[in-house]
């Protein structure tokens, strides 16, 4: 079997409608298409995805194509918030490119504040936490308006500190604290030219509305991208839930308590990586709107995955080039010439019989320039690469997106 996507997206969408549907079966095996491990330049497929898709799908496609890992997970929302904090101090073409890459318009600061407030609202049944911080080298003179904007709209904690080993430890400790210990560190060192770090941390923990019975979990084969089979703990249950299928994919909703859901996406046998990305770009939200209530026999693996990546090249490919060069315009931050020298993101996700837990930290480093209706029965056996999406029904922002090609890969 060729390379196929397993996408992890913790996201936010409008409520999905439920209704009955006509009976059709969808039990074909899924084969993908080998993708190129490169993010340099816009391929025709990437350009098409970007033209008709959304930030999360374009970013994930670039990261996934550039990774040799079978399991990939990123947080578009964490990246977007960290980048928006930084863009608040950008001017001219630099700011324009950053917002265009994220496909953002309007009052970005106000929108970011609303997103943070809606996602982090108190929820007794589901835990979602967002935290932002800015760590400034005490030698850098930062403009007051930039600091005030990030405090007011992003709730950012601002620290003026010496850039030494003690501060490195504090930054990594902040990451661990804000992700309940799931992301223990984000930085290995502080380089001599670095003057500022802008961090976002995102944490999610939700319990299934209907848990899997652990007694029904069995060791079963999972077919990896190269056709090899590995035995994994496969969870099983039958549930009445929202469901959609077309010639390219199946989608089923696995609801959490507290208003979130995980969308599980299983590509068809004929749908490869590039085709799936383009299909999602053009049809994803319309597919969600067409989901109907079915009785789904669901099998999916229990798994845990950690992933780390640089988003620098994908973001440059998406058009935000000037922010990463010596001609970057961040004079809204400081009169000292600065540019983004890297965007690092680490993620964690765990899925088991009781629910799911996920975390992400994005670090941007700035350096000196140089009543149930009758329902239809469906079968969905996730014993090969598939996609999963966790959504909150109120907002419309992607929190996490990832890929698992082998549940045994840590």
Regions found by a protein language model. Give the residues of each.
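Conserved short hydrophobic interaction patches
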Residues: 101, 279-283, 314-321
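Non-catalytic, conformational "gating/processing" segments within enzyme and secreted inhibitor domains
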Residues: 69, 111-268, 289-372
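C-terminal soluble interaction/assembly domains
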Residues: 342-410
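Detector for small/aliphatic-rich hydrophobic stretches
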Residues: 2-163, 393, 404
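Extracytoplasmic/secreted cell-surface and envelope-processing proteins
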Residues: 94-98, 272-274, 307-309, 359, ...
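A generic structural signal for residues located within well-ordered alpha-helices
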Residues: 77, 193-194, 382
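Internal alpha/beta scaffold segment
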Residues: 267-292
């Amino acid at each position: 079997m060729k390379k196929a996507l397993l996408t992890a997206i913790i996201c936010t969408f409008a409520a999905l409608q439920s209704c009955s549907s006509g009976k059709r079966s969808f039990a074909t095996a899924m084969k993908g298409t080998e993708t190129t491990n490169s993010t340099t330049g816009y391929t025709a497929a990437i350009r098409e995805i970007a033209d008709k898709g959304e930030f999360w799908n374009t970013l994930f496609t670039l990261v996934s194509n550039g990774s040799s890992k079978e399991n990939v997970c990123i947080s578009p929302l964490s990246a977007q918030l960290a980048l928006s904090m930084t863009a608040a101090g950008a001017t001219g073409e630099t700011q324009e490119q950053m917002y265009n890459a994220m496909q953002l318009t309007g009052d970005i600061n106000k929108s970011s504040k609303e997103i943070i407030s809606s996602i982090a609202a108190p929820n007794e049944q589901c835990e979602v936490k967002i935290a932002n911080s800015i760590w400034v080298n005490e030698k850098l003179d930062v403009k007051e308006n930039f600091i005030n904007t990030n405090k007011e709209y992003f709730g950012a904690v601002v620290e003026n500190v010496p850039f030494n080993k003690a501060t490195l430890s504090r930054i990594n400790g902040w990451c661990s604290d804000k992700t309940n210990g799931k992301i223990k560190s984000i930085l290995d060192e502080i380089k001599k030219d670095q003057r500022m770090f802008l961090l976002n941390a995102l944490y999610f923990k939700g319990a299934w509305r209907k848990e899997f019975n652990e007694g029904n979990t069995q060791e079963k084969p999972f077919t990896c991208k190269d056709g090899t089979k590995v035995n994994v703990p496969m969870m099983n249950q039958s549930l009445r839930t929202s469901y959609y299928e077309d010639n390219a994919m199946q989608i089923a909703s696995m609801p959490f308590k507290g208003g979130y859901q995980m969308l599980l996406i299983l590509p068809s046998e004929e749908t490869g990586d590039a085709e799936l990305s383009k299909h999602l770009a053009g049809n994803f939200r319309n597919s969600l709107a067409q989901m109907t209530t079915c009785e789904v026999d669901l099998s999916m693996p229990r798994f845990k995955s950690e992933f780390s990546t640089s988003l620098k090249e994908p973001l440059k490919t998406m058009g935000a080039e000037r922010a990463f060069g010596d001609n970057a315009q961040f004079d809204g931050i400081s009169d000292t010439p600065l540019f983004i020298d890297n965007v690092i993101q680490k993620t964690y996700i765990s899925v088991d019989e009781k629910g799911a837990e996920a975390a992400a930290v994005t670090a941007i480093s700035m350096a000196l320039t140089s009543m149930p209706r009758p329902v239809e029965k469906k079968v969905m056996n996730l014993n090969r690469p598939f996609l999963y999406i966790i959504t909150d029904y109120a907002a419309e922002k992607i929190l996490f997106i990832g890929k698992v090609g082998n549940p045994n890969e840590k």
